[in-house]
Amino acid sequence: MAQRVEPDTALVEFAAADKVFTNGFRALNPIDLSLARSEITVLVGPSGCGKTTLLRMAAGLTAPSSGRLTRRTERMSYVFQDPTLLAWRSIQANVELVARLQGVPRAERRERARRAIEMVGLAGFEKAYPRELSGGMRMRVSLARSVTSEPELLLMDEPFAALDEFNRERMGDELLNLWRSRGLTVMFITHSISEAVRLGHQIAVLGTQPGHLVRLFRSPSPPAAELAAPRDGAALRELRIQISEMLGGARI
């Protein structure tokens, strides 16, 4: 069973938070969930179980109908499934965009963008345009853009869903690199149980009719701050099997 995250270590807390839309549709039953600082929390579950609603709630884009949401930061970035890059702007300009909108001085935002582009392995592509890049490279640009605002909280809505297996794994590596270097708190949606187990410190399994938290798992061998730290493959395989069986044999 999951261990409770103490309030003083949680960046985001949902306390009996639910969501009922104005048409009467209940998207979420009351949910209790805490996101510990500098950890990756992954949401998995079938379509329509309220994962995106929960993510939007964390971002402040929708409010709980009842219960409470506590977010102890305003420094956050939201990464969508579609990279949503400006086609007429260079990669450099796209990565700088969020910092520019926040009023970050030009020299500083250029330096932030340079570091972010280098971190996701796209140094040398600063003058390229989105149409010249592959889908995986455009997603890396989106990830670089998301950190130029220097967020504490990174919210990701199935960001790798459109990528092939090779690029999904590479983007997972990029996310872990960013987490290690910046101590980010991450809330991440995926339909891939393997991806959830690989990336998550805790994994929230949601069910439908309406959306509710089925079970919260703590990883027996989570990502470590040290890149070379070994992980327990057998324990992770067992966790993957448990989650898969809980979701009715869904895709691993």
Q: Residues of each region from the PLM?
A:
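Catalytic Walker B motif of ABC-type/P-loop ATPase nucleotide-binding domains
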Residues: L154-D157
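Helix-to-loop junction immediately C-terminal to a conserved catalytic motif
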Residues: A59
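The feature captures the beta-strand-to-loop junction immediately N-terminal to the Walker
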Residues: V44-P46
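Conserved structural motif at the start of ABC-family nucleotide-binding domains
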Residues: V12, L28-P30
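Conserved signature/switch motifs of ABC ATPase nucleotide-binding domains
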Residues: A128-R131, S149
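Conserved ABC ATPase "signature" region
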Residues: R100, A107-F125, N177
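Short coil-to-helix segment of the ABC ATPase nucleotide-binding domain corresponding to the Q-loop/switch region
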Residues: R89-E96
